Amino acid sequence: IGNVAEFAFDGTGRWLAWVVDAQGKTGNGIQLRDMETGVIQVLESDEAQYRRLAWADEEPALVALKAVEDDDFEDPLYSLLAWQGVDGQGMPDRIELDPMEEEGFPQGMTISPNRSPRWSDDMEAIFFGIHEAELKEDAGQEEETGEEEQGPEEEPEGEPEDRPSRSGSDEIDEDEEPELVIWHWKDPRLQRMQELQASRDRNFSYLSVLWVEDGEFVRLADDDVENVSPARTGPWAIGRDDSEYELMGNLDGRRYQDVYAIDMRDGSRERILERSRWSNDISPDGSHFLYYEDGHYHTYEFATGQHRNLTAEIPTSFIDTEDDHNVEDPPVRPRGWTEDGENVLLYDGWDIWRVAAAGDDFENLTVDGKDEEIRYQGIIQFDPDDEPGYDLSEPLYFRMYGEWTKKSGYALMTDGRPGPPTCSRAWGPVSAPNCLRS
């Protein structure tokens, strides 16, 4: 296969998709090969460029970006392409979003090539980025070629030896020019940080979503709330805005943000947290959002708008007393969710606790960590491509460390019931290597 710019296998390894990018754009497109039969199918062909080819995680579906040149714009204009039912049974269903033809698309903006589009886990939506499209200078504008009429040049005042030199002999050599960095005291980011993040700023795009069933386009992020994180499934997202606190955060290290619940069906948002220091993530089922405040973990339920304190009744503390940063009552970081989204796994520095997202139930899974001074530091997830969250009905491997014995190793819990995971302990006075599954 020649002129291949990108390629990607699906999760099963049966289907190979690739982008053809030939000189002169002749024959450009996206093609698909069945690795079992060798049959090749052309999904798309046009005098255009194609980028960001990607498969959905579980279903036979593709997504990509298509770029065409436009004489009125500095850069190519992109549209979104997607296919469902890529299984060799006829031509798959094709989906396209062209900003030039979409009535609800923001004026003066286009799809960004700097963010990879992706399918949602439930296959109901496609996420992608948009940014401003830069227009070329008006070709009809007449260039001014005349020069302003200038009067006779005035002789500079002062004695000849005091007058500025016209020969250029007194000019400063470029290598000796002083470097001057001007920082305004109201800039929210320090000058050095602006320099370090310049590339990120240039490539920034606003998250948007296309709902597949009705073809509805919804913009999720804007200048008021730039940082948006969608749930893996369902219609909710979390937006974060630190504009009110960014300057002081860069000066004293205490970074706060306002947090919004966003309905991705229509883009409406509601502020649910103000001046929040620690917000975490959305549950795998998209129903709850976890955050930490005033020494306790809380959840916010999207459907009801209800906040619940999860840890007020638990007989332990989740404050990290060993963290000496310039913040009050920092938390010990959570260890994740159960895969059904019904429980969050919290760590108090010794034991790992299962706490219901509804706030009505909890239990200590490892039990003896604090009493035996063993730190069950985390749960091992062998495959990073596994479903988000942990299945408590399956065997769980814990990383463990003896606070005073300095032993380290791993423990296995097989039944998901609370109790010391002693059924299979492997540890000793050594630095335990990474635990891998064959």
Protein language model features and the residues they cover:
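Beta-propeller folds
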Residues: 1-438
